[in-house]
Amino acid sequence: MNAYPWLEIPRTVRFSDTDAAGVMHFQHLLGWCHQAWEDSLEQFGIPVGAVFPGGRSDQPSVALPIVHCHADFRAPMYVGDAAVIHLLPKRIDPGCFEVVSEISLNTQKVASGCLQHLAIDAVTRQRCSLPEPIERWIEASTLGQIQPL
């Protein structure tokens, strides 16, 4: 078990995640990555309404659009498979970060995905610093790791 439980998200492959061949469809992997990030924020204590627009609370002043993503499959995932998504957040610069998601079945790494986000002012759409709750989440998630200068 990880010392940071908000970075390990369990997920089961559902029938709706699979294609006609009975394996996980490629498009669902990035959706899993984003949903795991949302779950992680909530487990850490950050309400998703404070980060994502469209909720019932005040709208966030900073938007975090995805500016780059990629995914890799290493082995098939079938309906009913119980996976664990391990999140590896990393600050790229004061206004940009990425979250790598490593998906495992038991101890076998079967897939990975990466979502890179850029912070922009929600009104002006100009680049800005990451919001404080995201800074805290990244900082807490990388404690004890060597970070590049």
Swiss-Prot record:
The active site is at residue 19. It is an enzyme of class 3 (hydrolase). Pfam families: 4HBT_2. It comes from Synechococcus sp. (strain CC9902). This is 1,4-dihydroxy-2-naphthoyl-CoA hydrolase. Its EC number is 3.1.2.28. Gene3D superfamilies: Hotdog Thioesterase. It catalyses: 1,4-dihydroxy-2-naphthoyl-CoA + H2O = 1,4-dihydroxy-2-naphthoate + CoA + H(+). Belongs to the 4-hydroxybenzoyl-CoA thioesterase family. DHNA-CoA hydrolase subfamily. Keywords: Hydrolase. Catalyzes the hydrolysis of 1,4-dihydroxy-2-naphthoyl-CoA (DHNA-CoA) to 1,4-dihydroxy-2-naphthoate (DHNA), a reaction involved in phylloquinone (vitamin K1) biosynthesis. InterPro entries: DHNA_CoA_hydrolase, HotDog_dom_sf. One of its GO terms (biological process) is phylloquinone biosynthetic process. Pathway: Cofactor biosynthesis; phylloquinone biosynthesis; Quinol/quinone metabolism; 1,4-dihydroxy-2-naphthoate biosynthesis; 1,4-dihydroxy-2-naphthoate from chorismate: step 7/7. GO terms for molecular function: 1,4-dihydroxy-2-naphthoyl-CoA thioesterase activity.
